[in-house]
């Protein structure tokens, strides 16, 4: 998409859009946008403003978390998986995670938010719709932020005024084809920022299922990540503080409890995305095959998180904390017949439309914003601000929860491990978790770079399979 202008087909949403019941966490809601009479009607509509696909599968294929595994019997799931891994133009349109599906579905979410906002803005009693307006603005901002993460360059304040952005529809279109100017990345981020700030002021918390909606906590986690990517590090810290409060430890996942569960079937994945887990701030229910392809099924083995990547760079790699799978609260799942080395985090459930024909829809649930990831957002922002003691405190708070014996690091531990004497920079011949940064902004070699290497290394492990690694690759020019 290198053209300055483009056409978007704003596709009308299906009248009954929504995911059907699938275990206790899938929930179908009617689309009542054609009969909006009350704030409750708008709330029901806004269920469809949360995109029903997720880029994790695509972004994991793009990122350095995935390797090509050559062995008889290990095949690609389909041509889409091969095209994504090989970084060629993706011509496939049928899987749920293709760029074309992602594009149209996220713009559908924007359209839904705009329908809600149009109705709200036409009402005499605006105050009755304050919470719905806040949620609609946050959903629009989130959809556009996610589109930017896939289809745009990483934000860089030195180039954002010339880097291409994306169209940002702010009204309901009545024509099928509307011509939009892409604008710049600076324009796009400014519009996301505006919606985010207004939405944060209005967002409510009165939902039947709050973990599936933006609340003050999940919206603040979104803001923390957004401002980190926007290179506004003070604001990233500010909003992370709103999530974590004065006792971040109390917000974090009970990794030991999760690790104690069986890695077989869907036990660990369902526990990981449970709405009862305090650390899970926003859950996203989507149509996706990633729970199978990135999971324990013998499916899509050719392009997967391999033994080499696992042992040298990620979940079995050595870090300043020790050997990761010996130190951390998880069990690496693998069997002799699989190329994959995985953590059981993404559930897979197949909803049959016709059991006899084997036709239906695969589903997954993602923990899109969590307290643990927000803590590492704050740690990274503190490091980029030069607040190394605060960054180390956050790192150690996460390590205390994530590790079996509460391992703690000193600044010297971090600097020593990510030094040339101990861990050389990655090369294809000698892979390591330490990868060279290529950023427009300066990073000091003595303390800042080792701290950032450590935070990115831990985030890569902790969020494996969730699609976030690709954003670090983009932001740091890895």
Region annotations inferred by a language model:
Residues 1-22:
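Sec-dependent bacterial lipoprotein signal peptides
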Residues 23, 217-256:
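Aromatic-residue-lined binding/catalytic grooves and analogous aromatic/hydrophobic interfacial grooves
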Residues 237-372, 405-442, 458, 462-468, ...:
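Hydrophobic-face positions in mid-chain alpha helices that act as interaction patches
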Residues 22-69, 298, 467, 477-478:
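Membrane-proximal, proline-rich intrinsically disordered regions
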Residues 80-152, 183-186, 196-205, 359-366, ...:
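Conserved, well-structured interaction surfaces
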């Amino acid at each position: 998409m290198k053209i300055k202008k483009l056409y978007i087909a704003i596709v009308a949403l299906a009248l009954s859009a929504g995911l059907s019941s699938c275990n206790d966490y899938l929930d179908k809601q009617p689309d009542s946008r054609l009969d909006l009479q009350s704030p409750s009607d708008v709330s029901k509509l806004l269920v469809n403003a949360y995109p029903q696909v997720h880029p994790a599968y695509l972004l994991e294929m793009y990122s350095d978390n995935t390797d090509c595994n050559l062995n008889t019997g290990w095949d690609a799931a389909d041509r889409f998986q091969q095209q994504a891994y090989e970084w060629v133009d993706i011509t496939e349109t049928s899987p749920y995670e293709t760029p074309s599906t992602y594009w149209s579905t996220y713009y559908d979410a924007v359209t839904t938010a705009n329908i809600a906002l149009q109705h709200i803005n036409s009402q005499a009693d605006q105050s009755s719709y304050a919470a719905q307006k806040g949620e609609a603005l946050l959903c629009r901002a989130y959809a556009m932020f996610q589109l930017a993460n896939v289809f745009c360059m990483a934000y860089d304040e030195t180039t954002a005024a010339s880097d291409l952005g994306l169209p940002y529809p702010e009204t309901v279109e009545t024509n099928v084809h509307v011509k939009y100017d892409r604008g710049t990345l600076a324009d796009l981020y400014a519009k996301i920022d505006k919606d985010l700030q207004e939405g944060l002021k209005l967002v409510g918390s009165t939902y039947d299922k709050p973990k599936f909606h933006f609340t003050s906590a999940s919206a603040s986690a979104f803001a923390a990540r957004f401002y980190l990517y926007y290179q506004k590090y003070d604001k990233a810290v500010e909003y992370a503080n709103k999530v974590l409060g004065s006792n971040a430890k109390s917000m974090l996942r009970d990794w030991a409890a999760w690790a104690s569960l069986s890695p077989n079937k869907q036990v660990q994945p369902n526990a990981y995305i449970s709405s009862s887990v305090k650390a899970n701030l926003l859950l996203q229910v989507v149509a996706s095959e990633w729970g199978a392809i990135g999971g324990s099924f013998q499916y899509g083995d050719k392009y997967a998180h391999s033994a080499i990547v696992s042992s040298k760079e990620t979940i079995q790699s050595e870090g300043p904390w020790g050997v990761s799978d010996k130190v951390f609260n998880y069990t690496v799942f693998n069997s002799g017949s699989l190329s994959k080395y995985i953590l059981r985090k993404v559930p897979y459930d197949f909803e049959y439309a016709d059991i006899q024909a084997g036709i239906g829809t695969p589903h997954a649930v993602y923990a899109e914003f969590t307290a643990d990831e927000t803590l590492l957002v704050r740690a990274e922002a503190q490091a980029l601000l030069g607040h190394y003691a605060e960054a180390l405190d956050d790192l150690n708070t996460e390590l205390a929860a994530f590790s079996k014996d509460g391992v703690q690091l000193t600044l010297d531990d971090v600097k020593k491990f990510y030094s040339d004497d101990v861990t050389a920079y990655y090369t294809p011949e000698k892979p390591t978790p330490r990868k060279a940064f290529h950023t427009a902004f300066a990073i000091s070699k003595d303390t800042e770079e080792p701290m950032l290497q450590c935070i990115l290394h831990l985030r890569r492990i902790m969020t494996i399979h969730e699609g976030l690694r690709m954003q670090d690759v983009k932001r740091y020019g890895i």
